[in-house]
């Protein structure tokens, strides 16, 4: 397992080096952010109470990688068990300014002391691997964005141990009221799967 982990990190390092070496003329941007939230709701499903959610991101041209996390403040004193922990890693590529954005993500929220993070075996892993497609209409008066996310591998299994391919769709419309930026969002599950709670 240690050898597999080293191979994954080595491959990622080579890929990043190649990207940096071949696109040095493109703008590079680092993002460091931390949010405090009173409650954590993901895709309409309550996850935890007050949480700290750090973000670390890097983008170069149309390519970006993001590490995002979430942890509540209950720790071992939580009435529902051990503290909630989540780590999401995402790689995304935008196909031009008016094209769609494609993404691949590893979502892990097994929690404190549950599920080994570096276990990627199909029927043992606590990771959910998800592909995403986001498209924003190239219309200034109607900047509606549409997103489809599909869990294609990992812990999203049915009772028979087969992949569920759980999906989540979202429509988002940004607008302003008296210089205050707002978003109207509608999210839905296009079909029922046994692991609906994971969506």
Residue positions per predicted region:
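Conserved small/polar residues in nucleotide/adenosyl-binding loops
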Residues: 197-199
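Outer-membrane beta-barrel architecture
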Residues: 55-57, 90-92, 132-136, 168-174
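Short sequence motifs at beta-strands and strand-loop junctions characteristic
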Residues: 46-48, 81-85, 123-127, 161-165
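Outer-envelope beta-barrel architecture signal
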Residues: 28-32, 50-52, 61-63, 87, ...
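Transmembrane beta-strands of outer-membrane beta-barrel pores
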Residues: 36-40, 60-62, 69-75, 95-97, ...
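Glycine- and aromatic-enriched membrane insertion/assembly motifs of diderm outer-membrane
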Residues: 48-106
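Cleavable N-terminal export/targeting peptides
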Residues: 1-29
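Outer-membrane beta-barrel initiation region
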Residues: 28-56
